[in-house]
């Protein structure tokens, strides 16, 4: 049996890039909660003792940007300079302007267009992917890397491993078998965890705790064997972390946010963007389409692409590839998808309820992945049953 190795990585909510994603989405939530028609393009950057939010926001909402920045950093665990940032003492810079009137008239006619007339907020192409290798219909390498990161945060916050600090990265290599285009995981080849820690803990304690409290609860035993390789804090020391260790920027972790390197990516980031930004809404609707294709048994694995022009509601193209796993021809699946899904941005916002903020709705997406999550707020994960109409004889 010929197998191959494939690797996916993830980062924790305390990674500086992910801190920025969460701040941007916390601001989006606050705007949408008060004004569902808010137009938000919010970027965040951070370095030692500083967080800056900048971009274009047009909203009727009354939003205290500085307060949101500090509370988001605090809830992640950045409560002192020792851990990489002090949420209460750091400098918060704000440079937010209104959306360009040129863009506003072209996309939504200064809020006068009906939902079906709203144009795409920009050009671009987005991909959705699904695979039957996990219950989530997501790639196993990505699922395991993501869950390891989430578990690291859990044992830090609940006190199981008090030596942990907010920053951290994970990476999982899975050995796969290609079964006529479908991906079948055989075993976990390598597990890598690099986590920020305090001064008190030894490398042996770190390795023992990570194996017992992080890896064991996350990776099913059937995937681990005596040949599985573990790299646990291989650099030997990771005390300085968060924005003190590295600069952070919104939209720098787009593969972690999506499919861990599987499928394809159009390059557009998600966080800090309202649903007229097709980078986000377009990617969400094609995930729903791809997941629905696999969940409905039309294929074992598939990718869906959609593309847009600024100001134009209808997509320029829709593409489906089932990697040879389709039960019916890809062309037929494409026709079903085009019939069952409305790819116009204004209609995506309605069908996936994307104008609803609050309750950390989008903040939740900004760490540990936008897809494969079991949460009613992740409306794009709801499967639409798809059936092939048998052609008339």
From Swiss-Prot:
Cofactor comment: Binds 2 divalent ions per subunit. The metal ions interact primarily with the substrate. Can utilize magnesium, manganese or cobalt (in vitro).
Positions contributing to ATP binding: 15, 167-169, 235-238, 246, 252-253, 269, 273, 277
Keyword ATP-binding assigned: yes
UniProt KW Cytoplasm keyword: yes
UniProt subcellular location: Cytoplasm
GO MF term set: ATP binding; metal ion binding; methionine adenosyltransferase activity
Any single Gene Ontology cellular-component annotation: cytosol
Binding site for L-methionine: 56, 99, 246, 277
GO biological process entries: one-carbon metabolic process; S-adenosylmethionine biosynthetic process
Pathway where this protein functions: Amino-acid biosynthesis; S-adenosyl-L-methionine biosynthesis; S-adenosyl-L-methionine from L-methionine: step 1/1
Record EC number: 2.5.1.6
Catalytic activity: L-methionine + ATP + H2O = S-adenosyl-L-methionine + phosphate + diphosphate
EC class of the enzyme, as a word: transferase
Record keywords: ATP-binding, Cobalt, Cytoplasm, Magnesium, Metal-binding, Nucleotide-binding, One-carbon metabolism, Potassium, Transferase
Cofactor: Mn(2+); Mg(2+); Co(2+); K(+)
One Pfam family in the UniProt entry: S-AdoMet_synt_M
Binding partners and assembly: Homotetramer.
HAMAP family in UniProt: S_AdoMet_synth1
NCBIfam families per record: metK (TIGR01034)
Its job: Catalyzes the formation of S-adenosylmethionine from methionine and ATP. The reaction comprises two steps that are both catalyzed by the same enzyme: formation of S-adenosylmethionine (AdoMet) and triphosphate, and subsequent hydrolysis of the triphosphate.
Name of the protein: S-adenosylmethionine synthase 2
Organism the protein comes from: Populus trichocarpa (Western balsam poplar)
